[in-house]
Amino acid sequence: MKTISIKDIEGIRIGNAQNFTGGTGCTVILSETGMCTGLDVRGGGPASRESELLKPLAAAQSIHAVLLGGGSAFGLDAAGGVMQFLEEKGIGFDVGVTKVPLVCQSDIFDLTVADAHTRPDKAMGYEACKGAYKNNYQDGNFGVGTGATIGKFRGMDYCMKSGIGSYAVQIGELKVGAIVAVNALGDIYDHHSGRIVAGMLNEERSAFADTAKLLYSSYEVHDNKFVGNTTIGAIITNARFDKSQLSKIAGMAHNGYARSIRPVHTSADGDSIYALSVGNIAADCDMVGTLAADVMSEAILSAVKNAESAYGYLAYKDLKFI
């Protein structure tokens, strides 16, 4: 098994667009020929678009783009730009008079980071597609990762800056990768060592406050629980699977969330994972699902380690006590 770039998986294009001043952005994953896709949502507050298409009983067997965006529900407007871009290129489901691109989307909540009135819109979605054709994807404070933060159980005063991350591996001809925007209520753990590497800081910002311990300190209802969270990501593979199998792989990839984010899948998160099939390699579903959890954990680490301090929030690179 060797490590590769997420951009080494053929059949997709990935692009970022962002507004650094406004503190938000979006990241698009495009397939010109269509990609079979599954979805597993574990968080209690998702902001999403066209998720019904991905159910096994839905007629469409492939879609043309997955968009990961900021702006919460407001940011769902960005999919219109993706649709416009793909329609102009003649990509989509042929309905005779035109081709209708099938675009699914999930968004994070980043409205409290910089300018609450700056959100991904149709123009930004279009720019992300242009970026995909320029191969402009990178990890860190870009695309949907622009406004990502973590460790928000006590609100924004003690949280840290996060971003978008990716990780991919190859075994023989099989390629499996993950891309993820880490915007969690909880803290981020290094799944190798079991130690917190980013998350909620104490009042002196000299150590981690440990969200799980704070949560366990009282079983009474936490009225102050911050609701602006969500970790959204995608597994991308060149193996051939149907929607049911891909939904299973997406579900197994959530094990990567559970290893690396604590607490995770709360009512204050909208945690979601897509699984995309963009090839014809024959592979075992359970093997790929197990591998999906591994690459997702690594992608989460990449997201926090590549983040830069911004908007007054410290990043992993700034911490002196780790």
PLM features: what roles do these ranges have?
Residues 1-322:
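Alpha/propeptide regions of enzymes that mature by internal proteolysis
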